[in-house]
Amino acid sequence: MCVIIPPQKYGINGKLSYLCPEITLIECLPEREGKTRKENYDMSCILHIETSTKVCSVALSQEGHLIYHEEDFDGPNHSVRCGVMAEAALSFANSHAIPVDAVAVSSGPGSYTGLRIGASMAKGICYGRALPLIAIPTPQIMCVPVLLKHDDLPEDALLVPMTDARRMEVYAAVYDRSLREVRAIGADIVEAGTYKQYLDEHPVYFFGDGSAKCREVITHPNAHFIDGILPLAKNMFPLAEKAMMRGDFQDAAYFEPFYLKEFVALKSKKLL
């Protein structure tokens, strides 16, 4: 699904500005020759690539606006779709005379193959166009739509984005409402008491494609589940633009996604 949308400004200077209250817009922008920090930021356009789950998505943002996004929900065919979708986004930018200034990629954890495809695509574009690379942790990407759609969350709420792994295992992290890390990303075997230390003290919101299988296991009264949350490229831009302002870039030559676990190849059941 390709969507070209009118500008929507709800990023750095809008509804998500509280995600990083210590950063001011002007002070953190690098100066470039002939441009003030504000002028330089106004020109910045970022290509976003997200391939950590079965959904493949790309997006373009500029100055806190989401200007283009495309999503493919038809299953894990990233090797076919990712390049086509990225090229379509770059063509859109070119046709509107918008120079792309950086590439942001979802850094994991998630699908080993999906992450590898997305990282390879992002690195290739960065290398070919001499662009900086930005890496955004996948759990943080999932937090963005939650904070946008649920701005009435209690001040002491904790967010637990979950990516489905095998059986009752999930890749999860714990954040507060300002996306400060309460607990680092880890692989959790979900049982009734897995998050008890947080649930006893805070309302905790679970979401992501790994949360559905946890609903019947985690029955604490402080546990809340939010459906329909996936890591999508269109939700990367508030975080990517913060990284752009900070100059928080990766070395494209050596960047590797955060797989969390080593790849395990499944044995085919078919007789050779």
Language-model features, listed with the residues they occupy:
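DPxDG-like acidic metal-binding loop motif
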Residues: 104-138
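N-terminal beta-alpha supersecondary unit
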Residues: 41-109
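Surface "functional belts" at beta-alpha junctions
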Residues: 41-42, 65, 74-77, 132-231, ...
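Acyltransferase
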Residues: 226-272
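Short, positively charged and aromatic/hydrophobic N-terminal segments
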Residues: 3-4, 10, 15-18, 24-26, ...
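Stable alpha-helical structural segments in soluble proteins, enriched in small hydrophobic residues
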Residues: 89-93, 128, 146, 236-244
